[in-house]
Amino acid sequence: MGVFNYESETTSVIPAARLFKAFILDGDNLIPKVAPQAISSVENIEGNGGPGTIKKITFPEGSPFKYVKERVDEVDHANFKYSYSMIEGGALGDTLEKICNEIKIVATPDGGSILKISNKYHTKGDHEMKAEHMKAIKEKGEALLRAVESYLLAHSDAYN
């Protein structure tokens, strides 16, 4: 088994606390609403949303994958940090054991925020992760962020 790391940063015009509330804490409800072409639904299979919770994310018909299961590893409200692991389905296939993800949202002096994202791909056997594949996953996540950001800009009273 190998572990491949991919780190990235993305900026947002939305303040850190508001973005954390919308994108992380209520993302299970908001993302299927603002990006139904990407995610059909999110349901808690076990747990209450905190560490140990298992979620099933269902993708729309025509997507390359039907679903993915994720386990919540950490929710740090004070530091706007969220960690979770993809543990079943989706892109894991025969080559990945799991993908561990950490998102930390940091306030910027201009009132916006920076999302610092760390992904750890745990491969099966001697499989290697290609940079293009990791970049494609990052771009999909960024598209979800932009959909949430657009919603928040259009609904200034939401998630304050």
Swiss-Prot record:
Q: Which GO terms describe its biological process?
A: abscisic acid-activated signaling pathway; defense response
Q: Which InterPro entries match?
A: Bet_v_I/MLP (IPR000916), Bet_v_I_allergen (IPR024949), Plant_def-hormone_signal (IPR050279), START-like_dom_sf (IPR023393)
- Keywords tagged on the record: Allergen, Cytoplasm, Pathogenesis-related protein, Plant defense
> Record's Gene Ontology CC terms?
cytoplasm; nucleus
Q: Which PROSITE patterns match?
A: PATHOGENESIS_BETVI
Q: Which Pfam families match?
A: Bet_v_1
SUPFAM superfamilies attached to this UniProt entry: Bet v1-like (SSF55961)
GO MF terms, alphabetically ordered? abscisic acid binding; protein phosphatase inhibitor activity; signaling receptor activity
Classify the main location.
Answer: cytoplasm
The highest taxon in the source lineage is Eukaryota
What does the sequence similarity comment in the record state about its family?
Belongs to the BetVI family.
UniProt name for this protein: Major pollen allergen Bet v 1-M/N
Identify the gene encoding this protein: BETV1M
